[in-house]
Amino acid sequence: MKEAIINAVIQKLETELGRQSQANVQSNATTAYSASNADKQRDTTGFEAAFLAHGYAVHCMDLSHRLDELRSMPIEDFTGQEIDIGALVEVEMGGDVDWYLLLHCGGGTEVEVDRTKVTVITPESPLGAALMGNIEAGFVELPSGAEGIILSVC
């Protein structure tokens, strides 16, 4: 099941990369047009578009690099081990049971595989940081004070 989840995450991130790449192309086109067709001496539309295009380009490069890492990441079984990148974790918090996949990228991405909704979290998130190094049946406490129990790790 974990392989199917990771593949679904990769597919969603590839779609996002395509959107970001298209936005980068559009920003570059706006930059070229605005710079050569400025209305006034202080027209900064071209500069703003260039700044935006640069941001999209950096984001695309980072996402592309992270996708390459994700595609080559070995799928490990974390049963009985400390939680680390690549772990699929079931957590009960406040009466709700949720599944999380801990990855370096794609935080907040949600996928559904075999009628199970899984949310990607990163070690930089409060929940990701609380889970890192923890074990099955361990307790997690978030900075907000919310507490939960780790039901399973795979």
What kind of region is each of these model predictions?
Residues 1-66:
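Helix-rich terminal scaffold detector
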Residues 13-17, 74, 135:
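Generic secondary-structure transition motif, activating predominantly at the C-termini of alpha-helices
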Residues 33, 76, 141-142, 147:
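Alpha-helix boundary/interfacial micro-motifs
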Residues 54, 58-97:
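Long amphipathic N-terminal alpha/beta scaffold segment
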Residues 80-143:
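Non-DNA-binding regulatory cores of transcription-related proteins
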Residues 95-96, 144-150, 154:
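Short, charged beta-turn/beta-strand-edge "cap" motif at the junction between a beta-strand
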